[in-house]
Amino acid sequence: MLVDSFNRVIDYIRVSVTKQCNFRCQYCMPATPLNFFDNEELLPLDNVLEFLKIAIDEGVKKIRITGGEPLLRKGLDEFIAKLHAYNKEVALVLSTNGFLLKKMAKDLKKAGLSRVNVSLDSLKSDRVLKISQKDALKNTLEGIEESLKVGLKLKLNTVVMKSVNGDEILDLLEYAKNRRIQIRYIEFMENTHAKSFVKGLKEEEILDLIAQKYKIMETEKPKQGSSKIYTLENGYQFGIIAPHSDDFCQSCNRIRLASDGKICPCLYYQDAIDAKEAIINKDTKMMKRLLKQSVINKPEKNMWNDKNSETPTRAFYYTGG
């Protein structure tokens, strides 16, 4: 079992398999060239697999595959299948912008993927183009429908931004509710890579907009996880991830492995442990030692609301959010 210095059990790893992305979202990497990253720097997936086997043996129960855009990584379905074969009890989930999902959903399901989280920031083509710099809405919606068709579990993630998509909160809720998919609204998280004009809506503002149409019956905060779950009177549940008002550090159960082999104990701390050499060499003892050290290095809090702290400079496309 992996336990940090504050007695939190760490049983969840987010694994970035690439920094590459086919979107250039305003809140993530808007000014980054499309060919900014040399693929040769990527860790071989078979080596990452060996690291994750160690993590599973140490008690990890959930692995999320992220990017960048993870569906750009060749051989991903085979990688997932090998992970699933190693331990079928481990939940394997994937975060994606959905652009390539339609053609890959069936293979991902067959490989053993438990769930896919799809980013959907608007239901309007022109807005999706403005937000992501990609004419992507049709592909993303088709990817969602195909995932449902093949039996993949789904969640939707929406970053809510003032004067951009805040007026679509109810429309997106209806879209998700009609398909029996949970949607999670995410407060914009400031970072030095985002466009300066991007401003987010806070949790209470999101709730006020939903309350104009629906009565919100109850609130549930899972013991682990970043989102608060709200239930409408018709039984539908949606989530809000609100790092500004609820840092969820007390129940944090995760670490992150970046695509270059660095283990990040916390999304908002620059400190990381470089495990690249150990992973490349498949050095079992060293990988285990560095994994345990990264857990010990987890800070108590992320300092998000500390007035003296600086805006995070580590890119979300590097750690996968």
UniProtKB/Swiss-Prot annotation:
Please name the GO terms that the record assigns under molecular function: 4 iron, 4 sulfur cluster binding; cyclic pyranopterin monophosphate synthase activity; GTP 3',8'-cyclase activity; GTP binding; metal ion binding; S-adenosyl-L-methionine binding
Name the gene that codes for it: moaA
Report quaternary structure and partners: Monomer and homodimer.
Q: Which SMART domains match?
A: Elp3
Which reaction equation describes what this protein catalyses? GTP + AH2 + S-adenosyl-L-methionine = (8S)-3',8-cyclo-7,8-dihydroguanosine 5'-triphosphate + 5'-deoxyadenosine + L-methionine + A + H(+)
The UniProt record gives the binding positions of [4Fe-4S] cluster 2 as 249, 252, 266
Which family is it part of? Belongs to the radical SAM superfamily. MoaA family.
Binding positions for [4Fe-4S] cluster 1 per the UniProt entry? 21, 25, 28
NCBIfam families per UniProt: moaA
Record's superkingdom? Bacteria
Which parts of the sequence belong to the Radical SAM core domain? Answer: 5-233
| High-level lineage | Bacteria, Pseudomonadati, Campylobacterota, Epsilonproteobacteria, Campylobacterales
**Keywords, sorted A to Z:** 4Fe-4S, GTP-binding, Iron, Iron-sulfur, Lyase, Metal-binding, Molybdenum cofactor biosynthesis, Nucleotide-binding, S-adenosyl-L-methionine
What binding details are noted for the cofactor? Binds 2 [4Fe-4S] clusters. Binds 1 [4Fe-4S] cluster coordinated with 3 cysteines and an exchangeable S-adenosyl-L-methionine and 1 [4Fe-4S] cluster coordinated with 3 cysteines and the GTP-derived substrate.
Pfam entry (one): Fer4_12
- PROSITE patterns assigned: MOAA_NIFB_PQQE, RADICAL_SAM
Output this protein's name: GTP 3',8-cyclase
Species whose genome carries this gene:
Helicobacter pylori (strain HPAG1)
Pathway where this protein functions: Cofactor biosynthesis; molybdopterin biosynthesis
Cofactor names from the entry are:
[4Fe-4S] cluster
Share an example GO biological-process annotation for this protein.
Answer: Mo-molybdopterin cofactor biosynthetic process
Residues binding GTP, per UniProt: 14, 64, 95, 155, 254-256
Catalytic activity, EC = 4.1.99.22
